[in-house]
């Protein structure tokens, strides 16, 4: 009897140019959105944005769709979508957060302080992905990335290869930042 399935996990098949949907346009989501709009034209067809604050999504759509470099391929169009449309794309980016610790907090792991409330939010959208029979990538960008990926995987019934976290690069960069300040 085989205890472990050793078959490699394969990512969902994405089109040459993927439809990306992004939830929450706070500091993280809006920074990511700018990068995707400016640098993602070769792999992104369009970007759907959703935020609980309608005026925030409208502002970003207004600003970003007016950026057009003169001599390059067209940039991916940004459009405002309803929450029900978040899982109509190929790649879903979860940037939502109910709690961001103040920068003055110095004791304890601030990412874990975020976990309780953010877990509920990640679980909610994971269940929505399940209800929508979502077949694309569910990408977690909000902190703490690894525990939120686990919560999303458990709540969604998505395949493990569909849930991706983007946190190790941040942790490496944070370590490099503090190492550079250390002076030893």
Where are these regions (language model features)?
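Rossmann-like NAD(P)-binding element
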Residues: 73-135
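Substrate/ligand-engaging "lid" and interaction regions
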Residues: 19, 166, 173-184
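Gly/Ser/Thr-rich loops at beta-strand to alpha-helix junctions
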Residues: 25-30, 53-55, 140-150, 167-172
């Amino acid at each position: 009897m085989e205890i472990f399935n050793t078959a490699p996990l394969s990512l969902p098949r994405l089109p040459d140019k993927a439809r990306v949907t992004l939830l929450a346009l706070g500091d993280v989501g809006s920074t990511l959105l700018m990068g995707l709009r400016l640098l993602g034209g070769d792999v992104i067809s369009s970007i759907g944005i959703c935020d609980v604050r309608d005026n925030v999504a409208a502002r970003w759509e207004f600003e970003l769709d007016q950026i057009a470099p003169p001599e390059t391929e067209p940039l991916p169009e940004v459009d405002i979508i309803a929450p029900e449309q978040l899982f109509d794309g190929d790649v879903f980016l979860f940037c939502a957060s109910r709690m961001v610790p103040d920068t003055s907090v110095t004791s304890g792991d601030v990412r874990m302080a975020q976990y309780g409330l953010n877990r509920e939010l990640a679980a909610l959208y994971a269940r929505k992905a399940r209800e929508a029979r979502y077949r694309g990538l569910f990408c977690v960008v909000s902190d703490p990335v690894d525990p939120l990926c686990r919560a999303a995987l458990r709540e969604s019934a998505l395949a493990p290869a569909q849930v991706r976290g983007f946190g190790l690069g941040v942790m490496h960069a944070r370590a490099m930042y503090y190492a550079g300040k250390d002076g030893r």
